[in-house]
């Protein structure tokens, strides 16, 4: 197994540095030929989404499509693809990808509530993200 960093993932998608994009593509092709998995860590996905939004001004639709394609490719593996899919599904509609991934992780770990002052998250998950806890929640 090998891991890809954010800059490699971005080069693969954006192809703004032809030499680096080709090198990443060679790694992917070699991994496929040799049945080697390429792991993409959640932190790399968070950083990748941030770079695509902030630096390259990619649309939410394009980023969502990229993430879905990445998750569907057999060569790539993720520590918890179900959690990542959940975050991507919410990200398609609205929200910050990092926050959505954090909430998905909290749910995976069976947190009964998610305490946050983030109003946008509260709107997306009104019964789960709260800024006040009741005694029954503890």
Regions found by a protein language model. Give the residues of each.
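Residues that scaffold the ATP/ADP-binding catalytic core of kinase and kinase-like folds
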Residues: 11-13, 51, 124
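Short, well-structured N-terminal submotif of metal-dependent ribonuclease cores
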Residues: 1-40, 55-61, 133-138
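Alpha-helix capping/helix-boundary segments
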Residues: 8, 44, 83, 101-102, ...
């Amino acid at each position: 197994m090998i891991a890809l960093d954010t800059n490699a993932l971005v080069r693969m998608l954006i192809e703004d540095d032809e030499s680096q994009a080709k090198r990443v593509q060679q790694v992917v092709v070699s991994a496929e030929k040799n049945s080697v998995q390429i792991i993409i860590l959640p932190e790399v996905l968070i950083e990748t989404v941030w770079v695509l939004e902030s630096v390259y001004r990619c649309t939410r639709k394009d980023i969502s499509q990229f993430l879905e394609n990445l998750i569907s490719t057999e060569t790539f593996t993720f520590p918890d693809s179900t959690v990542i899919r959940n975050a991507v599904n919410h990200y398609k509609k609205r929200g910050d990808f990092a926050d959505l991934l954090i909430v998905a992780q909290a749910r995976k770990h069976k947190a009964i509530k998610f305490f946050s002052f983030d109003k946008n998250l509260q709107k997306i998950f009104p019964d789960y993200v709260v800024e006040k806890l009741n005694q029954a929640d503890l």
